[in-house]
Curated annotation (Swiss-Prot):
Active site feature: 188 (proton acceptor)
SUPFAM superfamilies, per the entry: LDH C-terminal domain-like, NAD(P)-binding Rossmann-fold domains
Annotated oxaloacetate binding sites: 99, 132, 163, 188, 243
Reaction(s) the record says it catalyses: (S)-malate + NAD(+) = oxaloacetate + NADH + H(+)
Protein name per its UniProtKB record: Malate dehydrogenase, cytoplasmic
Enzyme class name: oxidoreductase
Keywords noted in UniProt: Cytoplasm, NAD, Oxidoreductase, Tricarboxylic acid cycle
Binding of NAD(+), residues: 16-17, 43, 90, 113, 132
GO cellular component, one term: cytoplasm
């Protein structure tokens, strides 16, 4: 029995991440090899011609799972009937710009997209915010789309999670698929805390803790953390462009695990609405370890938090509270 197509919105679709992401979605990377999709692509008017070029290429690629493409600069048309929304469009910080200026541009973008999604998206639409500042953009979207359940709004920290997996796999010279349960706590920014205290590696002798195998706490508590925190900047320095293919791949991982479930015994990192778990203030979109089943995420409970970690969790929560206040000041 063929499945009904799922409508997936990508905003900022003519941009770098969008260009990497739409073929992955059309190929079944996000929702599986037997799930047909209809792509909705939104971008701003100056990018309309470029967006049309992407649409032409999607047609030319003849993806068997791709059952239709909507390419538009109209936010209502873009949001109508969508089941999944990946919000890549935002206002990037340019040299010499104050944080408040960037924040106020993004607040107005996410405020208007929130109301379009609320009015026109399918019931139970799942929303993933990728554009920076991702946690705070997601929070604004949540506040201006009150009828979208908070459990359906998330932001991308899977890229940081995957970066952490990659660093451990390189350090230990093991397959990245054998490393699991790293955690990204907090903000998708340089205050995020990549935590390996609960991470394990699948070895011929069974699962072993990452800390035990690395046996270099100075590296794990120092260079490892800063490498993951600063990885985005390192890629911009090397490529002269921000990370796109890794961000697109992480967005697919995030949605796939959310919709289809995480493997037994594995948790992943998602920016979700805090309920006070781990003494993180509620009312923030904060990255937690989660498991997913039946299209719902659940924060993993009962993990021990040492003193070193506690400070890191609090520091990134403070930054998110500041960002939230800054965003609210842009609204008033």
């Amino acid at each position: 029995m063929a499945k009904d197509p799922v409508r997936v919105l990508v905003t900022g679709a003519a941009g770098q991440i969008g260009y990497a992401l739409v073929p992955m979605i059309a190929r079944g990377v996000m929702l599986g090899p037997d799930q047909p999709v209809i792509l909705h692509m939104l971008d701003i008017a100056p990018a309309a011609e470029s967006l049309n070029g992407v649409k032409m290429e999607l047609v030319d690629a003849a993806f068997p799972l791709l059952k239709g493409v909507v390419a538009t600069t109209d936010v209502v048309e873009a949001c109508t009937g969508v089941n999944i929304a990946v919000m890549v469009g935002g206002f990037p910080r340019k040299e010499g710009m104050e944080r408040k200026d960037v924040m106020s541009k993004n607040v107005s973008i996410y405020k208007s997209q929130a109301s379009a999604l609320e009015k026109h998206a399918a019931a139970n639409c799942k929303v993933l915010v990728v554009a920076n500042p991702a946690n705070t953009n997601a929070l604004i979207l949540k506040e201006f789309a009150p009828s979208i359940p908070e459990r359906n709004i998330s932001c991308l920290t899977r890229l940081d999670h995957n970066r952490a997996l990659g660093q451990i796999s390189e350090r230990l010279n093991v397959q990245v698929s054998d490393v699991k349960n790293v955690i990204i706590w907090g903000n998708h920014s340089s205050t995020q805390y990549p935590d390996v205290n609960h991470a394990t590696v699948n070895t011929p002798a069974g699962e072993k803790p990452v800390r035990q195998l690395v046996s270099d706490d100075a590296w794990l508590n120092g260079e490892f953390i800063s490498t993951v925190q600063q990885r985005g900047a390192a890629i911009i320095k090397a490529r002269k462009l921000s990370s796109a293919l890794s961000a697109a791949s992480a967005a697919c991982d995030h949605i796939r695990d959310w919709v289809l479930g995480t493997p037994q015994g594995t948790f992943v990192s998602m920016g979700v609405y805090s309920d006070g778990s781990y003494n993180v203030p509620s009312g923030l979109i904060y990255s937690f370890p989660v498991t997913c089943a039946n299209g719902e995420w659940k924060i993993v409970q009962g993990l021990s938090i040492d003193e070193f970690s506690r400070k890191k969790l609090d520091l990134t929560a403070e930054e998110l509270t500041e960002e939230k206040n800054l965003a609210h000041s842009c609204l008033s």
